[in-house]
Amino acid sequence: MEDYSNLSLKSIPKRTCRIIFRTATILGICTLIVLCSSILHEIIHLDVSSGLMDSDDSQQGIIQPIIESLKSLIALANQILYNVAIIIPLKIDSIETVIYSALKDMHTGSMSNTNCTPGNLLLHDAAYINGLNKFLVLKSYNGTPKYGPLLNIPSFIPSATSPNGCTRIPSFSLIKTHWCYTHNVILGDCLDFTTSNQYLAMGIIQQSAAAFPIFRTMKTIYLSDGINRKSCSVTAIPGGCVLYCYVATRSEKEDYATTDLAELRLAFYYYNDTFIERVISLPNTTGQWATINPAVGSGIYHLGFILFPVYGGLIKGTPSYNKQSSRYFIPKHPNITCAGKSSEQAAAARSSYVIRYHSNRLLQSAVLICPLSDMHTARCNLVMFNNSQVMMGAEGRLYVIDNNLYYYQRSSSWWSASLFYRINTDFSKGIPPIIEAQWVPSYQVPRPGVMPCNATSFCPANCITGVYADVWPLNDPEPTSQNALNPNYRFAGAFLRNESNRTNPTFYTASASALLNTTGFNNTNHKAAYTSSTCFKNTGTQKIYCLIIIEMGSSLLGEFQIIPFLRELIP
């Protein structure tokens, strides 16, 4: 039987797309050249002496065929443009769905043989394959998206079963074939460094009998081997999941105070239940970074690389510290005037990256980049963001949406609104020297925080506060010009609607300048923490759904329980 274990699902539609697009474009250009040549030939060979200037009738008789030819040329060009821009992409999506479905049938039907495959192929319901990691409404959309009622789905996230300890730090990744999910199971209390185990699962989206999606768990592994993995981030890759964690042996504050880097681990979990873990060593980090932490939010698989969001502390006086210490990013709120001169505000913004509580380390965001060509690689690189384009280092999430790269950064510093960036770095030429990002201007949504960096803070100050609450862009957030607010930009998620306390979890949709629709729970004092949101579309019904994962306070079993909420989003 043929071995499908090395079959790359992504390569099929991409290769098909390139061939069809290039062929159509070349044919269109050739047609235009031929028609233009024909018209020019007709013009050049006009017999001017035969009476072109003699009478209006003769002029009209000569010009009219040219006009008709030009009309035909324009009509043909419009048809080619319509075919290339609309018809062909739709057909590609249809072909792609058929290919995925056929492959799934081969792996799950009579042709499947577990002795020569990496396990049964995981694949979402066909109605969802082409509705994932796409912009879900048009860029020109400027309406008010609203949430439908909570949908009663079976939870794919196991809860704590003991009053001691808690479950925390969810990370969720979704690609065209399957999803991956992980969280930390803290055994004694709910402190970051307490002894813990790690839960990791993968599964698929299925259509329920009630005509809405459910998340079916297909594979799970519970890592209870005595290794205290923390701050784990997950990424779905072809064939399975990748888990990136650091091993905690001391508190976060102690991690920043020392120069002895904690152990970093990269684990691969495949369809056939194979689990392979590597300890990774990053070049040019020892002696420069005090600590390196996975940034909790999910990573991405892009152009043969696995990318994870990272943050940590740079040691003063090192080359990395010196390179970044003069850089700072200072977004502006148009309706808020900050005290002090511009130079004073700039100085405050620059100093906001260095945190006294964390032994005066410079808090830095970065991306861990690992080639997937060696699927069990321990060869990874850490590439820093340019601090003149992003805020102080913090937890975050990476996205690939319509082949564009984006980055959410937790608002842990003085800017209280959600931080979302377009990544402009080109990975097609290999690992870059630095990550370039462009801020998506937005003054929503707030997060709770301590003074002087509470929920209404937009002026430079030195603090470390806030809470992780990633966003999901519903349409293209690209501004019309540099740092110009896009009035049509819409995004969704959940936030903690309180000035300073981690309470009152609330679902929202927002524009760059206003909350558009909010719905919460009856108890506005209910405790909560991290939130993570992922929206997608059923391309058959055209319905949009948002999966919103929230760490909800629990008074019975542990301090927190992680709950997945599913709602339809109505544009």
Swiss-Prot record:
Sites carrying a glycan are N272, N284, N335, N386, N454, N498, N501, N517, N522
Q: Which InterPro entries match?
A: Hemagglutn-neuramid, Hemagglutn/HN, Sialidase_sf
Task: Look up the EC number in the record and give it.
Answer: 3.2.1.18
Q: Which GO terms describe its cellular component?
A: host cell plasma membrane; membrane; viral envelope; virion membrane
* Gene Ontology molecular function, alphabetical: exo-alpha-sialidase activity; host cell surface receptor binding
Q: What job does the chain carry out?
A: Attaches the virus to sialic acid-containing cell receptors and thereby initiating infection. Binding of HN protein to the receptor induces a conformational change that allows the F protein to trigger virion/cell membranes fusion. Neuraminidase activity ensures the efficient spread of the virus by dissociating the mature virions from the neuraminic acid containing glycoproteins.
Protein family: Belongs to the paramyxoviruses hemagglutinin-neuraminidase family.
**Assembly behavior:** Homotetramer; composed of disulfide-linked homodimers. Interacts with F protein trimer.
In the record's own words, the domains note is: The C-terminus (head domain) is involved in binding the cellular receptor.
Protein's name in the database: Hemagglutinin-neuraminidase
* Gene behind the chain: HN
